[in-house]
């Protein structure tokens, strides 16, 4: 058991180091630093984000709601980074459209991803904004423990970030997702090492 724990730590560190080393340094990393813990919270949504669950769990929705209430631009940033996160997130099975559905699926009041370009300080007509405007209409899914509600729009103001921000944060998110996946394996399963 102790050997498996050490192996998990080493695998996590290797994943983070390799992805961070491959990613170019990003300007304006302040938003990435600010939203770092929010990536960790979103790992509670991994089952929904990978399509293993048809609805987000209550823990997932509580985490998403906390992000939205505390700093809504970080929720936008998480979605944006999933879009620009590259093959590593796709290899884990993260479905971009599921992340985009989170505010609606968790039935957050006063939340709409159409506000994300403004919160992130990107031009609504830019290609970076397309992830939010092209996918703004999603079918709501009732999450576990929530009753149906109609999302409204947000009036929160936010800072700015470029689409390239947060590669190190994405690496951390990928590592956390990988660890979450491995921890869900039955105890008798070995990792082949």
Curated annotation (Swiss-Prot):
Residues 138-161 are annotated as: Disordered. It is a lipid-anchor; GPI-anchor. One of its GO terms (biological process) is cuticle development. Residues 166-193 form a propeptide. It holds the Pfam family LTP_2. A lipid is attached at residue 165 (GPI-anchor amidated aspartate). InterPro entries: Bifun_inhib/LTP/seed_sf, Bifunc_inhib/LTP/seed_store, LTSS. Up-regulated in the epidermis of stems and leaves. Expressed in the epidermis, stem cortex, vascular bundles and mesophyll cells in root tips, cotyledons, seedlings, leaves, caulines, flowers, siliques, pollen, and early-developing seeds. GO terms for molecular function: lipid binding. Keywords: Cell membrane, Cell wall, Disulfide bond, Endoplasmic reticulum, Glycoprotein, Golgi apparatus, GPI-anchor, Lipid-binding, Lipoprotein, Membrane, Plant defense, Secreted, Signal. Glycans are attached at residues 110, 135. Disulfide bonds join 35-76, 45-60, 61-106, 74-116. One of its GO terms (cellular component) is secretory vesicle. Residues 1-22 form the signal peptide. It is found in: Cell membrane; Secreted, Cell wall; Endoplasmic reticulum; Golgi apparatus. O-glycosylated on hydroxyprolines; noncontiguous hydroxylproline residues are glycosylated with arabinogalactan. It comes from the Eukaryota. Belongs to the plant LTP family. This is Non-specific lipid transfer protein GPI-anchored 1. The gene is LTPG1.
């Amino acid at each position: 058991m102790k050997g498996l724990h050490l192996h998990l730590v080493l695998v996590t560190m290797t994943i983070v180091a390799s992805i961070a080393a491959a990613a170019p340094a990003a300007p304006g990393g302040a938003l990435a630093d600010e939203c770092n813990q929010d990536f960790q919270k979103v790992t509670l949504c991994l089952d929904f984000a990978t399509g293993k669950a048809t609805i987000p769990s209550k823990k997932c929705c509580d985490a998403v709601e906390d992000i939205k209430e505390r700093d809504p631009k970080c929720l936008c940033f998480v979605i944006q980074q999933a879009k620009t996160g590259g093959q590593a997130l796709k290899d884990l099975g993260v479905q971009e459209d599921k992340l985009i559905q989170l505010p609606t699926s968790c039935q957050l009041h006063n939340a709409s991803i159409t506000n994300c370009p403004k919160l992130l300080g990107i031009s609504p007509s830019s290609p970076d904004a397309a992830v939010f405007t092209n996918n703004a209409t999603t079918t709501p899914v009732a999450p576990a423990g929530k009753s149906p509600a109609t999302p409204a729009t947000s009036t929160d103001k936010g800072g700015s970030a470029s689409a390239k921000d947060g590669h190190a944060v994405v690496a951390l998110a990928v590592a956390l997702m990988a660890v979450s996946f491995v921890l869900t394996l039955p105890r008798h399963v070995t990792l082949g090492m």
